């Protein structure tokens, strides 16, 4: 399988609205999975310290993350799952955070930053353009530790 690197707040802003065009525009690299992949996967490169708290749970600047997209029609089933870290794409950019709550009645998600300097956020699902579970840390430079 090949997954591509996208753009957004985690990396340089791109004003392209069609996600298919955005995904096709950037480089990809082979990623080996231990199962057959039927979903769309995307690589994201961490560009800020919002998920860094000094623990082994940290996702550091420069880390490459393999993320699986959750399609909009599946959002009603509940987004809290076995992958706590998520990438959320909105009009304002892309956020890497920990998903702490999915309120299906209010149609919102609550996102938590590991960095104490960043505030938690509540985002309306109507404002979400794409939603990804962070499944795997693909690459980390040892200089981050």
What would you call each of these model-derived segments?
Residues 1-61, 71-75, 140-145:
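Short, positionally conserved secondary-structure boundary motifs
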């Amino acid at each position: 399988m090949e997954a591509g690197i996208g753009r957004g707040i985690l990396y340089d802003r791109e004003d392209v609205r069609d996600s298919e065009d955005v995904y096709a525009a950037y480089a990809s690299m082979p990623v080996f999975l231990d199962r057959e992949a039927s979903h769309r996967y995307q690589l994201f490169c961490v560009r800020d310290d919002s998920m860094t708290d000094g623990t082994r749970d940290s996702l550091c600047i420069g880390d490459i993350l393999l993320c699986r997209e959750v399609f909009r029609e599946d959002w009603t089933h509940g987004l809290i799952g076995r992958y706590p870290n998520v990438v959320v794409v909105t009009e304002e950019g892309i956020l890497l955070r920990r998903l702490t709550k999915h309120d299906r009645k209010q149609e919102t998600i609550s996102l938590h930053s590991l960095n104490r300097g960043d505030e938690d956020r509540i985002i309306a699902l109507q404002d979400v353009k794409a939603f990804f579970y962070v499944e795997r840390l693909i690459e980390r430079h040892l200089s981050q530790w």
